[in-house]
């Protein structure tokens, strides 16, 4: 279609004075773009994308997600999901950010009625930030105490009954002594402890008791509240937010430089840990346990759902960082190459992290003389702060060194992820209120992030983390990603979008991308979301169900995030009247005058290009129907003809 609403000289008449408003918004956008900072070079952008996409999701979440969902067989649905959902969504978000030079909210000038998608994603991002920072606090805590002459979780305290030390050999001796005194045939292995019989309490390792009793001071009943913040974790949380602020305070000028370290250092540590891990006794069994496929799990829909969730969590799609990072690129930057590098590297890092972690856990099972490695693996937070420390404490040579390396690596990975998420929020605010100084917004939002994080460093904090992650992070991000894709491909139109890509990248869009964006990606996401909603079960923490009030609060959290989409759409139609309200709604589904490249000269060239494309299609329609459909097919397939 001809772009009457985005002519460089004047906008379309919207009635009730909205033409002047649109012109003012357009002028503000062009002024902002002229002042918008770009990456120092393309490598800074690539390193930043790696630092957010290759993070805790690869080392912490992927290993236990894989082993819980078929082991090596999980790699098959994960790779399929990566190619049909992960890569297409990642590339699409890169394109949207770079094409418009705008953040997560402002890009919706393409379909103004969908602006609520951007605000909803911002809400989901804030939820993720709130608990992600508490994981950094835990990581910092373990990092600091790792400098002691003896790892504090490797030995029992006097007040801990039924505790066995996590020291090398002594742990095994104590454990085997406990076994010999009990009815071995009645053993019920659970985690890294077990129940000897009905009258014997569960033996627990010192690493588990240290985490539960010393670090988080776990509270198993939150009906009377979550308790007060722990001062040590509060201090660690404060330090984490100071580091985050220092990295983002100057925008991409500072975060771009930090990205080199944030992206590359974890690989150095990961390779060091890998070399050490594969040389440990029992490592081979752990690796085989991780990679051995359970083919029956491929027919389990839950496995496919978990593959999608892991893909979103790992690549950070649907929450805004990729759009935000790409918005600071030059218009002609080669993002196709970067998208392929990051998504491929993300998968390889997940495999590398899984092999490393399960090699360590294999050694733990060997030391405990436990045949089933499943019995030493904990999911969630316990994997990073119980199973890993327990395994490291059994290293014969300088376990303190490997503990420092491991937790510093986790901290760097977490910083890389949260810097991107926090920068997304700062960019949204600065795009909306152009007179604000970036560093001031970064300071205020960092202070707010610290205050929100306090609830997670209380004795009941892990309950809140589980609740917010489930309702406010996973499901909000997922449903809004569906709306994001639908708005661009189905409402704005696949052909329009592909024309924009061709103009920006100077290359036709291949059949693979067209098929994924128009069919495979949205259909798979919709089916998986419906299945997830239909089979959803009450969430639990530490095998305990949440109180009914907590579940209600969780659903309210989800409703607030998802409701941003329709509410902001109705608001836009109300504030941009086009006669009747129905006409206003229809108009909100068409690109506004602000849509397109932000640079005025590039914008003029784009308008000419789009109008030429519209003229070509108008000419094609006047030919025979057979020829018309043939040309439509070749256009869809990305032919250059």
Curated annotation (Swiss-Prot):
Its membrane topology: Multi-pass membrane protein
Cytoplasmic membrane side: 1-38
Originating organism: Drosophila yakuba
Described function: Unusual broad substrate spectrum amino acid:sodium cotransporter that promotes absorption of the D isomers of essential amino acids. Neutral amino acids are the preferred substrates, especially methionine and phenylalanine.
PROSITE patterns: NA_NEUROTRAN_SYMP_1, NA_NEUROTRAN_SYMP_2, NA_NEUROTRAN_SYMP_3
Chain positions carrying an annotated carbohydrate: 183, 188
UniProt xrefs under CDD domains: SLC6sbd
Protein's cellular compartments: Membrane
GO cellular component: plasma membrane
Transmembrane segments: 39-59, 72-92, 109-129, 229-249, 258-278, 307-327, 341-361, 401-421, 441-461, 474-494, 516-536, 552-572
Family membership: Belongs to the sodium:neurotransmitter symporter (SNF) (TC 2.A.22) family.
GO molecular function (one): D-amino acid transmembrane transporter activity
Top-rank lineage group of the source organism: Eukaryota
Biased composition (Low complexity): 9-24
NCBIfam families: Na_transp
Region (Disordered): 1-34
The protein's name: Sodium-dependent nutrient amino acid transporter 1
Main location: membrane
One GO BP annotation of this record: D-amino acid transport
Designated gene of the protein: NAAT1
Compositionally biased region (Basic and acidic residues): 25-34
Record's keyword annotation contains Ion transport: yes
Keywords tagged on the record: Amino-acid transport, Glycoprotein, Ion transport, Membrane, Sodium, Sodium transport, Symport, Transmembrane, Transmembrane helix, Transport
């Amino acid at each position: 279609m001809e772009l009457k609403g985005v002519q460089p000289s004047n906008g379309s008449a919207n009635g009730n004075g909205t033409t002047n408003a649109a012109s003012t918004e357009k002028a503000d956008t062009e002024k902002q773009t002229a002042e918008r900072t770009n990456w120092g070079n393309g490598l800074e952008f690539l390193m930043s994308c790696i630092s957010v996409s290759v993070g805790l999701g690869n080392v912490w979440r992927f290993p236990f997600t894989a082993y819980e969902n078929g082991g090596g067989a999980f790699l098959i649905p994960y790779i399929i999901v990566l190619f049909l959902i992960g890569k297409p969504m990642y590339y699409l978000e890169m394109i949207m950010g770079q094409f418009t030079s705008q953040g997560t909210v402002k890009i919706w000038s393409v379909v103004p009625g969908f602006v609520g998608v951007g605000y909803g994603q911002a809400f989901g991002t804030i939820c993720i930030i709130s608990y992600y920072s508490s994981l950094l606090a835990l990581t910092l805590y373990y990092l600091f105490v790792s400098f002691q002459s003896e790892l504090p979780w490797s030995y029992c305290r006097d007040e801990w009954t039924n505790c066995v030390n996590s020291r090398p050999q002594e742990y095994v001796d104590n454990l085997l002594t406990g076994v010999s005194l009990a009815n071995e045939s009645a053993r019920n292995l659970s985690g890294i402890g077990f129940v000897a019989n009905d009258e014997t309490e569960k033996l627990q390792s010192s690493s588990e008791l240290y985490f539960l009793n010393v670090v988080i001071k776990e509270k198993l009943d939150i009906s009377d509240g979550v308790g007060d913040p722990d001062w040590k974790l509060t201090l660690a949380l404060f330090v984490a937010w100071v580091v985050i602020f220092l990295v983002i305070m100057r925008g991409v000028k500072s975060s771009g430089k930090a990205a080199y370290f944030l992206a590359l250092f974890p690989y150095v540590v990961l390779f060091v840990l890998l070399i050490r891990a594969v040389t440990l006794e029992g490592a081979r069994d752990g690796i085989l346990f991780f990679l051995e496929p359970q083919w029956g799990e491929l027919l389990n829909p839950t496995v496919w759902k978990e593959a999608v969730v892991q893909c979103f969590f790992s690549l950070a799609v649907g929450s805004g960082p990729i759009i935000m990072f790409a918005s600071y690129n030059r218009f002609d930057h080669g993002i196709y190459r970067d998208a392929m590098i990051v998504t491929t590297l993300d998968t390889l890092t997940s495999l590398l992290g899984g092999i490393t972690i399960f090699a360590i856990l294999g050694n733990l099972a060997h030391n405990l003389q436990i045949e089933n490695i499943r019995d030493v693996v904990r999911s969630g937070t316990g994997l990073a702060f119980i199973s890993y420390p327990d395994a490291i404490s059994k290293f014969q040579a300088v376990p303190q060194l490997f503990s420092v390396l491991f937790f510093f690596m986790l901290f760097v990975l977490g910083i890389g992820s949260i810097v991107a998420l926090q920068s997304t929020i700062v960019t949204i605010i600065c795009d909306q209120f152009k007179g604000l100084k970036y560093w001031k917004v970064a300071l205020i939002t960092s202070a707010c992030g610290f205050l929100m994080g306090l609830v997670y460093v209380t004795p009941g904090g892990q309950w809140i983390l589980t609740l917010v992650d489930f309702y406010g992070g996973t499901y909000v991000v997922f449903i809004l990603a569906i709306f994001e894709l639908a708005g661009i491909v189905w409402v704005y139109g696949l052909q329009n979008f592909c024309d924009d890509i061709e103009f920006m990248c100077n290359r036709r869009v291949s059949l693979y991308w067209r098929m994924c964006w128009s069919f495979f990606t949205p259909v798979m996401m919709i089916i998986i979301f419906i299945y997830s909603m239909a089979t959803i079960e009450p969430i639990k923490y530490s095998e305990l169900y949440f109180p009914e009030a907590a579940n209600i609060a969780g659903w309210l959290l989800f409703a607030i995030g998802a409701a941003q989409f329709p509410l902001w759409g109705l608001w836009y139609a109300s504030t941009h009247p086009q006669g009747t309200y129905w006409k206003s709604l229809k108009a909100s589904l068409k690109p506004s005058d602000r849509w397109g490249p932000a640079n005025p000269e590039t914008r003029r060239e784009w308008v000419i290009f789009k109008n030429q494309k519209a003229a070509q299609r108008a000419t094609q329609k006047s030919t025979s129907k057979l020829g018309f459909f043939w040309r439509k097919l070749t256009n869809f397939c990305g032919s250059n003809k």
